[in-house]
Regions:
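Conserved glycine-rich cofactor-binding loop
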Residues: 29-30
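Conserved glycine-rich Rossmann-like NAD(P)H-binding loop of the short-chain dehydrogenase/reductase
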Residues: 43-59
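Conserved mid-core segment of classical short-chain dehydrogenase/reductases
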Residues: 105-122, 160-169, 214-217
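Catalytic Tyr-X3-Lys loop
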Residues: 106, 113-135, 150, 173, ...
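Catalytic loop of short-chain dehydrogenase/reductase
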Residues: 150-197
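Short, small/polar-rich loop/turn modules that mediate ligand/substrate recognition or access, typified
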Residues: 196, 201, 252-254
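A conserved structural motif in NAD(P)-dependent oxidoreductases
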Residues: 226-237, 248
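Short C-terminal tail/terminal secondary-structure segment
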Residues: 253-266
Length: 266
């Protein structure tokens, strides 16, 4: 299900109509995804974003400024297997995306599973969303127009969790989360090399903990263990992503930008 219109603007000097940049964000209705959608809208882009829930998508759209709504293109889409990816690519391959932001994930995988079978499935699901999905989207979207790819990863793709932060024996940060994010960081480097001749820059961002889904006790403990003494705020998420999609980072590809308040420095 898709809503939206093509967005254009007119250069006053030449009166030439130029199509605005189109951005594709997977996972656009989560804590981080919503900040990215709003940020790109503020930069006057047309934003396509995926969500697995029409209810969440509709709720999010109600919170967006009225003047931006027509520049939003919500796509209700599950990514559970290769067929889902292939159907999505077939449908949107001709869209002239300038930027791809790979941010999709399944929050339910955060909970450590009880049985080996459940654990096995969660491991596969996490790897699928962090590696397979970004890879197949990156190599199959229209490279004639694609200029930037940014993979959203985590500080736990750089360092393992600190056991002193968790009172539930890592249940809130299962091993497959960090492993999949580490793989996504390396995928970014591989794609940066392989897509360089097409003038497509590929980078990743490892964010630290972001306020919004944790209790006060966790925030206080996290603050004691982080050099900046706090978690990231949702409003701090967009600008680093924008930096990697702008001419200010024109010489950067294959880089993993760490925004974690200094967590990984010790």
């Amino acid at each position: 299900m898709v809503y939206g219109k093509k967005r254009n603007f007119i250069l006053k000097t030449t009166k030439t109509i130029i199509e605005m940049k189109k951005i594709l964000i997977t996972g656009g209705t989560g804590l981080l995804g919503k900040e990215l959608v709003k940020g790109f809208l503020d930069k006057k882009c047309t934003v396509y974003f995926t969500s697995t829930s029409k209810q969440n998508s509709d709720k999010f759209l109600k919170s967006i400024k009225l003047k931006y709504k027509k520049y939003c293109v919500p796509i209700i889409q599950n990514f559970n297997n290769y067929d889902d990816i292939n159907q999505f690519i077939t449908k949107y391959k001709k869209v002239k995306f300038d930027t791809l932001i790979n941010n999709a994930r399944d929050i339910s995988n955060l909970n450590l599973k009880v049985t080996n079978y459940e654990h096995y499935n969660s491991f596969n699901n996490e790897i699928f969303l962090a590696v397979y999905l970004p890879y197949f989207l990156s190599i199959n979207l229209n490279h004639k127009f694609l200029n930037h790819i940014v993979n959203i990863t985590s500080m736990y793709g750089v360092v393992p969790p600190n056991k002193n932060l968790y009172t539930d024996k890592y249940k809130s940060s299962p091993i497959y989360y960090g492993v999949s994010k580490a793989a996504e960081i390396h995928l970014s480097k591989e794609l940066a090399v392989r897509l360089a001749d097409k003038k497509i820059r590929v980078n990743s961002i490892s964010f630290g903990g972001i306020e919004g889904r944790v209790n006060k006790k966790f925030k206080k403990l996290y603050a004691k263990m982080c050099p900046l003494g706090r978690m990231l705020k949702p409003k701090e998420v967009f600008e680093p992503v924008w930096f990697l999609c702008s001419n200010q980072s024109s010489g950067a590809t294959g880089h993993n930008l760490i925004i974690d308040g200094g967590w990984t420095t010790w």
